[in-house]
Amino acid sequence: RKLWDNYYVPYVKGYFSAFGRFRSDDVKTGNVLGYVGSTSSATFFPTQVSDDSGAAYDIDLKVLPCPKFKDGDDYAVQQGAGMVVTKGSEDEIKASIEFLKWFTQSENNIEFSVGSGYLPVTKEANNIEKIKSVDSDISSSMEEILTESEAEINDNNLYYMHAFENGNDARTVLQEAFGDTAQQDRNTVDERIAQGESAEEAEAEFLSDEYFEQWYQNVLSKLQAYEG
């Protein structure tokens, strides 16, 4: 219920929004003021906002810690692209291993991180002073991103979604249950307001305990299909 109250409810009330494929796109068009995103997404963060008239305004990036529930434990999500050595010839496998060894050396990995926003993969390289010593040309925005990210890693327990059969399908269930449902219901609220209802009247159906319980039981039944 806490997730519902802190994601779905403000979304239906119009406090949260999602229009483009990525939230950094929504910042660029001025539709949102901030978002929770990955470190790599910050490399696409715009320096200007353009409104419907075509006028452009300069903006600055401010990086903040990921939000947490009050009195909650210190956890942060760890997610991103990975590398594996696939089946191949003996020479291909050896070459792949050598590349991974080279790529994960601190200096090489830091160069990649500064350019992409992906975090270094070793504890030694996840240090902003070490990063700046390797790449002195780091931009102010990337320095801010990596500095905050270092703190997130060191001050939190990192977790990730464990692999299980049909795990992507289960994840899609949750995405549709939260994101898609919230957007659809917000669209309905907008339509009702356009027809003359007050915001309170238009939102009432979706903010009831009955609506939450119906939603919860529906999601629960879908997720139970993936139990091992």
Question: Where do the language-model regions lie?
Answer:
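A ligand-binding cleft/hinge motif common to bilobed small-molecule-binding domains
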Residues: 39-55
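Conserved C-terminal helix/tail region of periplasmic/extracytoplasmic solute-binding proteins
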Residues: 150-228
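Extracytoplasmic/periplasmic substrate-recognition and gating elements
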Residues: 9-13, 50-123
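Non-transmembrane alpha-helical segments in soluble domains
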Residues: 4-8, 24, 28, 97-104, ...
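Alpha-to-beta junction loops
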Residues: 29-41
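Short helix-initiation/N-cap motifs at beta->coil->alpha
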Residues: 15-29
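Glycine-centered hinge/linker elements that transmit conformational signals in sensory
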Residues: 1-18
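An extracytoplasmic/periplasmic, membrane-proximal ligand-sensing/linker region
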Residues: 124-157
